[in-house]
Amino acid sequence: MAELGQQTVDFSALVGRAAEESFLSFKELVDKSKSTELSDTEKKVSLLKYVAKTQQRMLRLNALAKWCKQVPLINYFQDLGSTLSAHDICFTQAADSLFFMHEGLQQARAPVYDVPSAVEILLTGSYQRLPKCLDDVGMQSSLDEHQQKPALRKLEVLVRSKLLEITLPKEITEVKISKGTVTLSVDGEFKVLVTLGYRGHLSMWRILHLDLLVGERSGPIKLEVTRRHILGDDLERRMSVAENPFTILYAVLHELCVAIVMDTVIRQVRALLQGRWKDAIRFDLISDTGTTPANQEGEADSVSLRTPGMKLFYWSDSDKNSGPFIKIEPGSDLQIKCSHSTFVIDPLTGKEAEFSLDQSCIDVEKLLLKAICCNRYTRLLEIQKELLRNTRICRTPSDVILQALLDEPGIEGDNMVDSKERVEPEVLRVRAYGSSFFTLGINIRTGRFLLQSSKSILTSSILEEFEDALNQGSISAVDAFINLRSKSILHFFAAIGKFLGLEVYEHGFGINKVPKSLLDGSSILTLGFPDCESSHLLLMELEKDFTPLFKLLETQMDGSGKPQSFNDPSNILRAKKIDIGQIRILEDDLNLITSDVVKFVSSFSDAEGINQASGHRQPGLVDEALTEMSGSQLSFSSVVDGVFGLQKVTSALMSIDGHGLVPKNLSAVTGHGKAPMLTSYHSDSLYNRQGPLQSSSYNMLSSPPGKGSAMKKIAISNSDQELSLILSPSLSTGNGVSESGSRLVTESSLSPLPLSQTADLATSSAGPLLRKDQKPRKRSASDLLRLIPSLQVVEGVASPNKRRKTSELVQSELVKSWSPASQTLSTAVSTSTKTIGCSYGNLIAEANKGNAPSSVFVYALLHVVRHSSLSIKHAKLTSQMEALDIQYVEEMGLRDAFSDIWFRLPFAQNDSWQHICLQLGRPGSMCWDVKINDQHFRDLWELQKGSKTTPWGSGVHIANSSDVDSHIRYDPEGVVLSYQSVEADSIKKLVADIQRLSNARMFSLGMRKLLGIKPDEKTEECSANSTMKGSTGGKGSGEPVDRWRAFKIEAVGLTSLWFSFGSGVLARFVVEWESGKDGCTMHVSPDQLWPHTKFLEDFINGAEVESLLDCIRLTAGPLHALAAATRPARASTATGMPVVPATASSRQSNQIQQTQGIIAPSTLAAPNATGQSASATSGNTVASSAPSPLGGGFHGVAMLAAAGRSGPGIVPSSLLPIDVSVVLRGPYWIRIIYRKRFAVDMRCFAGDQVWLQPATPPKGGASIGGSLPCPQFRPFIMEHVAQELNGLEPNLTGSQGATNPNSGNPTVNGVNRVNFSPSSARAAMNRVASVASGSLVVSSGLPVRRTPGTAVPAHVRGELNTAIIGLGDDGGYGGGWVPLVALKKVLRGILKYLGVLWLFAQLPDLLREILGSILKDNEGALLNLDQEQPALRFFVGGYVFAVSVHRVQLLLQVLSVRRFHHQAQQNGSSAAAQEELTQSEIGEICDYFSRRVASEPYDASRVASFITLLTLPISVLREFLKLIAWKKGLSQSQQAGEIAPAQRPRIELCLENHSGTDLDNNCAAKSNIHYDRPHNTVDFALTVVLDPVHIPHINAAGGAAWLPYCVSVRLRYTFGENPSVTFLGMEGSHGGRACWQRVDDWEKCKQRVSRTVEVNGSAAGDLTQGKLKLVADSVQRTLHLCLQGLREGGNNNNNTHQKEFTI
């Protein structure tokens, strides 16, 4: 059975048997299926069984086939198992044998003694029977020094004789014999030290030492000691039996070295794969049978007995299948050979590259880098040869340079492998332009082309696009570099355009829209000029030699102002070629390299080349990107001024041109009687100072024989005649468009052309025809010819058709005008335009070759821009003139640098401003000027220089101009308007500026004519050049002329006029015409006088100067009196500010004043300018912002202390800013509105009185307008007028006197209070004293005392007495006349009267709401209201309160109902008597109402708090009355001098509610005292004004620094059986903590006050003093102590802790 298991079957037979069996079964199945006995189901089942059976058989075969692959391994394991079994049996047998033998060994351990040998040794002393084998292992003594030398000589002789007998291999490079040894060396492999004497035989070689020379960069490879001994023994044995032992030695060691070298190579390649090269390389192993692919881990799939070779592939990304590779393998001669897959050239030798491997220092990466270097050089060399054969790219040898730097490839390799974008050492440099190159390299990792450029000559996206195309092979290198060169030049010009401020249209804007008829090539750049909106475009295309060609296009704009498409050629109005090959270079152009140009060009090319070209070197130039350079676009003028400055223009040329000494040449109408639609481009004005310009349309005319050198060559334009007149578009009668070319001026080119040649000039037209929809107009040319001053000599122009005669006449006049001055001009021009003999086209060609710097392109484009600037300016300005229907003519000439346009504005009247000249300015700049010759502005020019002989006199100065009008300046001949650019509405702005100048001129002359010049100031008489529309039927027309003597002109400017009114400068006015406004703007100082100046401005805009002055004269006095009346009656003393003269030259920066030249209120302050902040100056009611509950709670107290009022804690008796607002309803109609409820109309008339009357409400009632009724208004004002006129002043405090109108030294009292100097005060008093003389009467705002002898005229007093006697009821809307001398006092009384009426109007609603919310109907209510008195009555409990208006105050009367019941009072108890107020308490209530509640400024919250007090029970009310009486007594004692007012804090009951509620929002919440009747509590507040003596020094910034420091203590009084006072809170002013800067100190003070209130509020004290009084006194003392401690603690600098004070 065992034998059956060991039998084998051939696997092929098994497979065959299985296949045969399967086939037979399938055949049998088919046969059965053909029979009809079986059903379909049975057939399917049979087929399924067959499939399953066959599947199982095949699966077994598959498993068996996989198992067969393991048969060699199984056999090997079976052999190992058999061997191990045999070893096991042997070990078992040996163990058994040792077990059975150990007993016998015990018996054999006794020694057997060799007696004979011992006897021999003892007897003879020697042992002859010693075995020979012991001789080899015995110890032998070494030879001494004397024995060694002979032995070595003998051995060396033997070695040499032995070497002569054998043949050494030729591979052995060194054989050295020394001291009996032979050293054999093979370079790069091994080194062996041998000698004779192997195993004692001198005929055989013995190896003493063995070293391997194979190594890496880290050093040679070292063998282990054991391996070296084993290898040496093996070699010795082989050499002992070999015929040629050294052949065997070399063969073995060489094979070993080859194996080590290949292993080292493979190991290094694996390291490169795992290192930085990664997927950039791969390798395959080469065996005997062929190439064996190896996995990237380096493990071979098969084992070969021979050392395999290797293929190292690189640039695998470029070609995955068959990339270039290096083959490293042992050759047939067993030598390591290295070869490259393709032919490559060594850049060092220029021959085919040879590759070898240095076995002593194996470096595969170095070999790889050399191969890559040679391969790159070979590929770039092929591209270089292609480029050198192309003449467009290579014009000079330096255009295409192959750069190869491979001295030490290993050093470069460390940095090159990791850098993907770095330019490699082997690069191909192709010139782009100038010193800028394209660099073509090859990536060291991928083999892909790397395309780079010098700095920023092209964008990275374009370079990447061409780089991908080169790598894909879709484009040849020649085409790529031609396109790159074109794009780089276009990109450079685009960058120059951005640098110059031009607009660059990206990505083929021009290619898509410019018709093909305008283009000759595909490389095109479209540049747009700033502010042109693409209406003018500059096209640039490159020729085959990369020379730029420029074309200037003018496009037709659509209705929306946008350019139309270029696809339709009819939309292109004009196309002009600019040939830079004809632009000559000036001798100093290339030396004018500015720092901006150097910095810009350095960002595109080498800075050294630019510096060398410019003659100097600037190290450290900043390289900026193109986006940075184009971020801040420069304008034309800034760049052109910096590069092409005007310093070359001689002074003679400027003087001749500036004063018009040389007449200008004129252009005539075209030959067929048709004027062009748009003025053609004129290139003669572009290079008049910098150099000549010549275009392709030149006709060169040489001087005729006999004329000599006087007649030089002169360029003739392609127009009909040399001298042609170009009319405005409105004069066009046809559709022809002419284009004038350029004129070449050389040296003496200004010599006149003979008349015989002017008629033979050729004509041509390069522009399209006039649009058909343009409607021509006919007008006589003589009308427009007269607009030009230089054509005034031309007479007799019959019609436009006689142009030849006109031109001949004009030319004859010009020829006559040629004089020696013109020759001087010729010399100057020729000197300044000296050329160097070459053009910019030649220079650009040299720059393309690298012989000129790149800055040449900048100057070339600059000259083209200069060439186009005048044409663009001319076309844009004239088109705007045409749109505005402005007639103009143009004047041009050979000798003039600029072309001038003369025009007349439509609004020009009569012969004013006939000569308005528009100068286009210098080429290259968008600046243009307009000059107006006018005598008025010439006078201002003289006045500006300080001349006192002008018609304005010596007292008038020049007014400063605003920054907006900085473009307008004076000129000796008039005025000049300068503009920096041409915008879409430039002409419209120009017309607006001229209109403003005209209006200002007309107004100034009208004022000067009306006011005249003072006798002491007028130095010469002059007549005005303009007529003013007088005010016919105006007010005061019948008054004498000297009524204007109070007016005085102080300053005059281009668009402004300053004048003052009043002998003491009552008011100053600045009238100016601001830019962007239709009419004028008036500024008044002081600005409180006129709420607005609309009516005054309307007078000026309507040219009604007399009405303006009349309005000012009649309304200034009443408005001044009103401003004085609205000031506080007792203002605090302040230091006066001197009045600055109106001639101050400093410019004000006030935001209210929009322009320069406005006199600020602080500068031109009138006598009454200070302290008028209480009056509202706007036309509408001023709404004040709601103050905060904390900060606003002490504002009234601060105002009180600042104003010096008595009664601390209350609002001062003055008007608030929200009380009064003034509105002008007409020029002479002033409405005074008091708190939106009452309004008084003041109408000004000629004479010395005004009409005052309450404003009558409209039909809808006073709620929508007008005023509430003012009862007894007319008697009130009449009474005040009578008192003032009769010298009765009962209500004024202080001693007041009157001034004698005839006295020359008036007495002034209290001047400092109103803040003006004594001189101005005297002037004000003089104005007051001028009443009797019939002149202007204005109150100065001061109380005036009249002497007893002074009396008002009797008829005036009689009229007033009659008026007072005849007064009756007028419904509250009656008015009366008020003289100006009494107006201020009457207005002040009226405002107080209106305040009382307003406060009375608040009472009914307050009574209804407060009494209704606290009391029942039978406990308190409003009884009756009488609006006519006015008066009202209300009752609270058993008392009736009557409030009535008496003059300017509210009076309160209290009537006790219980006093009429005497019996009840007698029978009543004492308790009932205590519940009734005594007469003194009633008097205290009435006095408190008059003194504190109904006082100024009137506040409804005080009335609401007072009414709330009246609703309290009698006992509680008596507590508050004791507090009020104690406070009143304390104030009286302080006023009497018992205690200084500043010695202790002042405390009072606070009635004001500063919660920010609106005045018109009547509600019970206005009360600051809150009565909770169900709980028997009253919440109230005490205001404490701190003692300023004890307040520490605090640097209080802001507007609250002058306010006193206050503290508000909020308390709650609970009355009943156990009355008590509790502390609710405490707040301080100035941010919430008053003068306590530290939060801890403030909290401590608050706690102390709280404890004080708690102690004193609950303690039972003297009831007769009152609990509230005791609490208030304690709070006052506590705060006083806290303040003293705060001051003492702040003064002690050394003490860090503040002292604590206790009560």
Swiss-Prot record:
<dbReference type="InterPro" id="IPR013947">
    <property type="entry name" value="Mediator_Med14"/>
</dbReference>
<dbReference type="GO" id="GO:0006357">
    <property type="term" value="P:regulation of transcription by RNA polymerase II"/>
</dbReference>
<dbReference type="GO" id="GO:1905421">
    <property type="term" value="P:regulation of plant organ morphogenesis"/>
</dbReference>
<dbReference type="GO" id="GO:0003712">
    <property type="term" value="F:transcription coregulator activity"/>
</dbReference>
<keyword id="KW-0539">Nucleus</keyword>
<dbReference type="GO" id="GO:0009266">
    <property type="term" value="P:response to temperature stimulus"/>
</dbReference>
<comment type="function">
    <text>Component of the Mediator complex, a coactivator involved in the regulated transcription of nearly all RNA polymerase II-dependent genes. Mediator functions as a bridge to convey information from gene-specific regulatory proteins to the basal RNA polymerase II transcription machinery. The Mediator complex, having a compact conformation in its free form, is recruited to promoters by direct interactions with regulatory proteins and serves for the assembly of a functional pre-initiation complex with RNA polymerase II and the general transcription factors.</text>
</comment>
<comment type="similarity">
    <text>Belongs to the Mediator complex subunit 14 family.</text>
</comment>
<keyword id="KW-0238">DNA-binding</keyword>
<keyword id="KW-0346">Stress response</keyword>
<dbReference type="GO" id="GO:0009506">
    <property type="term" value="C:plasmodesma"/>
</dbReference>
<dbReference type="InterPro" id="IPR055122">
    <property type="entry name" value="Med14_N"/>
</dbReference>
<dbReference type="GO" id="GO:0045944">
    <property type="term" value="P:positive regulation of transcription by RNA polymerase II"/>
</dbReference>
<feature type="region of interest" description="Disordered">
    <location>
        <begin position="755"/>
        <end position="781"/>
    </location>
</feature>
<protein>
    <recommendedName>
        <fullName>Mediator of RNA polymerase II transcription subunit 14</fullName>
    </recommendedName>
</protein>
<dbReference type="GO" id="GO:0009627">
    <property type="term" value="P:systemic acquired resistance"/>
</dbReference>
<dbReference type="GO" id="GO:0008284">
    <property type="term" value="P:positive regulation of cell population proliferation"/>
</dbReference>
<comment type="subunit">
    <text>Component of the Mediator complex. Interacts with CDKE-1, HDA19 and LUG. Interacts with PTAC12/HMR/PAP5 and PIF4.</text>
</comment>
<dbReference type="GO" id="GO:0140922">
    <property type="term" value="P:positive regulation of thermomorphogenesis"/>
</dbReference>
<dbReference type="GO" id="GO:0009631">
    <property type="term" value="P:cold acclimation"/>
</dbReference>
<keyword id="KW-0805">Transcription regulation</keyword>
<feature type="compositionally biased region" description="Polar residues">
    <location>
        <begin position="755"/>
        <end position="766"/>
    </location>
</feature>
<keyword id="KW-0217">Developmental protein</keyword>
<keyword id="KW-0341">Growth regulation</keyword>
<keyword id="KW-0010">Activator</keyword>
<dbReference type="GO" id="GO:0016592">
    <property type="term" value="C:mediator complex"/>
</dbReference>
<keyword id="KW-0804">Transcription</keyword>
<dbReference type="Pfam" id="PF08638">
    <property type="entry name" value="Med14"/>
</dbReference>
<dbReference type="GO" id="GO:0009738">
    <property type="term" value="P:abscisic acid-activated signaling pathway"/>
</dbReference>
<dbReference type="GO" id="GO:0043565">
    <property type="term" value="F:sequence-specific DNA binding"/>
</dbReference>
